[in-house]
């Protein structure tokens, strides 16, 4: 099954009607799959009680279930040109994984929403990112299990154009269903090296 996923930082995309939670093994990035990392305009998120966090109004207990905590690997683009990488492990309690299946294309669409910037970039929940921190609540995130290669390279969106039209065109070439993206698509687009066609 071809697994492609768009990772966004916006709760506006999520709703009870079209979001389901799936388990991490179904989304193994290291298993010859590629991912597109796209960031949308951030919106307010609220942290759930317990060890998991979720966007507002995104949980339907009849269809969804919380993921068990597991470690994440984040990739921070530290340069606007060329290839560079910086990885750090995050706790799953800082993020919510919301995914749904596009049966016609046999692809999985996934959303990762970051919690409040004070937690995601602080020294508590997310841990320190060293001397280089992403813009609060907008740092690029690479979803996957611990099997994701340690040195994942991320290229800046500038290589694909900076306008909405160019970025949306790039998503279309990757067969991303644009009906799943809100109209306020903006900010940055990242792609893991090795996922090009």
Swiss-Prot record:
<feature type="glycosylation site" description="N-linked (GlcNAc...) asparagine">
    <location>
        <position position="102"/>
    </location>
</feature>
<keyword id="KW-0843">Virulence</keyword>
<dbReference type="GO" id="GO:0005576">
    <property type="term" value="C:extracellular region"/>
</dbReference>
<feature type="short sequence motif" description="RxLR">
    <location>
        <begin position="65"/>
        <end position="68"/>
    </location>
</feature>
<keyword id="KW-0325">Glycoprotein</keyword>
<keyword id="KW-0964">Secreted</keyword>
<protein>
    <recommendedName>
        <fullName>Secreted RxLR effector protein 86</fullName>
    </recommendedName>
</protein>
<keyword id="KW-0732">Signal</keyword>
<comment type="function">
    <text>Secreted effector that dos not suppress the host cell death induced by cell death-inducing proteins.</text>
</comment>
<comment type="similarity">
    <text>Belongs to the RxLR effector family.</text>
</comment>
<feature type="signal peptide">
    <location>
        <begin position="1"/>
        <end position="17"/>
    </location>
</feature>
